[in-house]
């Protein structure tokens, strides 16, 4: 059946700021307490969506979550009217207010793991929201994520939107940032590839400096839940030393699409065994795996983390070639820029590189791949998606004007104590649900 990959990017929320909440994320920590520009952040992401849609790629948008999360603050013991809750949290525990105000749901690669209907036992598209239990500011996202996905992919005959896995360290799940899929054609059965940082119940190497956020047990549970074929499901461990170097998700060191894996030499434990397993599984489906392995002598792990070379989007074009979408930081790193020039000049599957300014997201550790959730849809499934979430000229214009109307152009961590920010955000989100036709999505609307 004819199918295409759609990308659903997260729209950056009005509370976008740099609070340095993500230990293990080098960019997040290094930009802590600097001023952010929510308006610029949202527009940078929206421009990427529009330009990719203009190139013919299926491009959707996912709305921000309500922030600050008054639900979290009340659960943590702050009481009174909404303004009182914010004031008390700002005075007594500003780090908790920062966690409750994070716009991190913009990085929809962590929203869920998605398996297309060609791979699942019941021939539905399956979504499992990630529990993101390693970080407080992200662990509060999954319920709203489930609600949003259920609103957009509402046809239960075609879509299965699950709850997140239990939020325990043994089942730490970071979503599609540690998952990719290989196939000959999008509509054909494929090989699903899960990458984990550690295993809870068996001994193995683990990082020592930064935590491994994804467990083998979580990856396996998602595969079981989605009804994936064992022979077409591959698990690999990310190298602990690269986690300690700031590779907190696999999508900071590798990206794959269709029959191509683009990765760093040091991405995986026992990398040749990983390549062999993927090649064998994909070969059984009639396709040949192309591995583009970047040697450390050309691009070091430090260069990869600093430029986010691998936190790129690998997009398949109609002519069978692939296009790489990278942040502008890749052009500002001499080693990475030289590698990309040589890559495009070669005769491999990647024939084009597009560069985007995503500086506001990048300063928090999120590149092009972080901002998108990939969903493979056949024609009938695409027709069942809520129509107003697809990016085109009209929706782009509406969202661009909406950002101009509602977003601040400067936000520092101390501004999170401003009770007006909550009112501004709610007003913006209430209008957004009307633009996107999603109904009463947020707690304050119910």
UniProtKB/Swiss-Prot annotation:
Residues annotated as binding substrate: 19-28, 110, 137-138, 213, 251, 364
MF (Gene Ontology): N-succinylarginine dihydrolase activity
Enzyme Commission code: 3.5.3.23
Catalytic activity annotation: N(2)-succinyl-L-arginine + 2 H2O + 2 H(+) = N(2)-succinyl-L-ornithine + 2 NH4(+) + CO2
Enzyme kind, highest EC tier: hydrolase
InterPro entries linked: AstB_sf (IPR037031), SuccinylArg_d-Hdrlase_AstB (IPR007079)
Keywords assigned: Arginine metabolism, Hydrolase
Pfam families: AstB
Catalytic residues in the record: 174, 249, 370 (nucleophile)
An example Gene Ontology biological process: arginine catabolic process to glutamate
Annotated metabolic or biological route of this protein: Amino-acid degradation; L-arginine degradation via AST pathway; L-glutamate and succinate from L-arginine: step 2/5
Quaternary data: Homodimer.
Protein task: Catalyzes the hydrolysis of N(2)-succinylarginine into N(2)-succinylornithine, ammonia and CO(2).
Cited HAMAP family: AstB
Stated family: Belongs to the succinylarginine dihydrolase family.
Protein name per Swiss-Prot or TrEMBL: N-succinylarginine dihydrolase
